[in-house]
Amino acid sequence: MTTNRKDEHILYALEQKSSYNSFDEVELIHSSLPLYNLDEIDLSTEFAGRKWDFPFYINAMTGGSNKGREINQKLAQVAESCGILFVTGSYSAALKNPTDDSFSVKSSHPNLLLGTNIGLDKPVELGLQTVEEMNPVLLQVHVNVMQELLMPEGERKFRSWQSHLADYSKQIPVPIVLKEVGFGMDAKTIERAYEFGVRTVDLSGRGGTSFAYIENRRSGQRDYLNQWGQSTMQALLNAQEWKDKVELLVSGGVRNPLDMIKCLVFGAKAVGLSRTVLELVETYTVEEVIGIVQGWKADLRLIMCSLNCATIADLQKVDYLLYGKLKEAKDQMKKA
């Protein structure tokens, strides 16, 4: 069942197209008089206890099947060559099946910046086992309640999740990132996570891979919930009050360097990409994908130069305009 389900996730992730992307409702104000040379632009950022050379990473996607193994090897090669973080999909499949080697990418990519992922439904003992076996630089702990509810074989008991989060925060020996899975993390959840000691979250909003869509494609039911959750930019707007206390990572529908920059303008420390990179490795050779990702770095620098920003922190000073749903939501937030 696990193998079939993981391969279905890949298939349905690749086929879905979102009719709305919140990044299109943000317009950045161009600066006509430049302040910096292009070679002065610094892309480095800091989160999860370390400095990173680039403000984007390959986010958790897959594992637990032969197809997942093939994809993970390609993604690991891209990430290692480009010097960016790669986070594997949920390690739960390997915990259930010790012979599953679909997550074993470090031996063939020794310089890889590797993260891994586990669900908050799993007790901390399994999180500790995951860290021991994978030796990651960070551990994503994902929350996916709507996905679980839509899965015929999904979890139905959730009372333990908060105590699990407290345990993870206290006992896991590497930095943890509390991660949504495409439904947009709300401010109250960030507040509760902060109380438990969490200092880094991935908001992962609607607009990219929809696990509601994926599970409804698998079961053929409840497709009216396919657009459940908050869009990525909406989740980021909602989290503004927390950006000085909690490191905000952002993912969900990020398509290109301009989308990345828009996240960074609103205080994100870094930006995760899943389906965009998955589509690339399924369409082009690994060498071609490496060239594309390296090009993203150059594009980030030129956009920052045109905005008069020498550092990632400078981007938070950029003026912007909001349109459509984002503007309406921000106006409502002002009145609340």
From Swiss-Prot:
Gene Ontology MF: a single term: FMN binding
Cofactor annotation: FMN; NADPH; Mg(2+)
UniProt entry tagged with the keyword Flavoprotein: yes
This enzyme's EC code(s): 5.3.3.2
GO terms classed as biological process: isoprenoid biosynthetic process
CDD domains: IDI-2_FMN (cd02811)
Binding positions for FMN per the UniProt entry: 60-62, 90, 117, 179, 204, 209, 253-255, 274-275
Positions annotated to bind Mg(2+): 148
Residues binding substrate, per UniProt: 5-6, 147
Catalytically driven reaction(s): isopentenyl diphosphate = dimethylallyl diphosphate
Domain of life the protein comes from: Bacteria
Compartments (UniProt record): Cytoplasm
First-listed, main subcellular location of the protein, grouped into a coarse class: cytoplasm
Keywords assigned: Cytoplasm, Flavoprotein, FMN, Isomerase, Isoprene biosynthesis, Magnesium, Metal-binding, NADP
Coiled coil spans: none
Cellular component per GO, a single term: cytoplasm
Pfam families in UniProt: FMN_dh
Top enzyme class: isomerase
Record's function text: Involved in the biosynthesis of isoprenoids. Catalyzes the 1,3-allylic rearrangement of the homoallylic substrate isopentenyl (IPP) to its allylic isomer, dimethylallyl diphosphate (DMAPP).
Homology family: Belongs to the IPP isomerase type 2 family.
Assembly: Homooctamer. Dimer of tetramers.
Protein name, per record: Isopentenyl-diphosphate delta-isomerase
